[in-house]
Amino acid sequence: SGSCTVKTCWMRLPTFRTVGDFLKDRFDGASRVIYGNKGSNRASRVELHHLEPENPAHKPPSPHDLVYFEKSPNFCTYSGKTGTAGTAGRSCNSSSPALDGCELLCCGRGYRTRTQRVTERCNCTF
């Protein structure tokens, strides 16, 4: 008869790229916090805790901010304690601005360039 008696609604997730970009933006703006003490509630004698920025000049985090308690280990240097191998001695791409680029991978230590000439058989036919 042309009339609609049933409606179906559903929620759809954003694209993976959209979620990734959102999380990366939050990660880049994350701030280190400490566990602060707001005082006590006299009625229940329960201590109320909250997160305070490590740097008092920063604003307190909102419920939507990404925060962290501990600094990340230094992945540039070897550490048996954290199990990080460091980046010394690794090959890097001097023309890449990405994670494999020498500027990021060498952690500001500088790097040596090496030019190689490679001759290979290409099995070309003319």
From Swiss-Prot:
GO molecular function terms attached to this record: cytokine activity; frizzled binding
Keyword annotations from UniProtKB, A to Z: Developmental protein, Disulfide bond, Extracellular matrix, Glycoprotein, Lipoprotein, Secreted, Wnt signaling pathway
Signal peptide boundaries: none
Cystine bridges: C92-C107
Post-translational modification: Palmitoleoylation is required for efficient binding to frizzled receptors. Palmitoleoylation is necessary for proper trafficking to cell surface. Depalmitoleoylated by NOTUM, leading to inhibit Wnt signaling pathway.
Coiled-coil annotated spans: none
Residues linked to a lipid group, O-palmitoleoyl serine type: S1
Gene Ontology annotations of biological process type: canonical Wnt signaling pathway; cell fate commitment; neuron differentiation
Subcellular location: Secreted, Extracellular space, Extracellular matrix; Secreted
Carbohydrate-modified residues: N93, N123
Biological role: Ligand for members of the frizzled family of seven transmembrane receptors. Acts in the canonical Wnt signaling pathway by promoting beta-catenin-dependent transcriptional activation. Plays an essential role in the development of the embryonic brain and central nervous system (CNS). Has a role in osteoblast function, bone development and bone homeostasis.
Family membership: Belongs to the Wnt family.
Protein name: Protein Wnt-1
UniProt lineage: Eukaryota, Metazoa, Chordata, Craniata, Vertebrata
Gene behind the chain: WNT-1
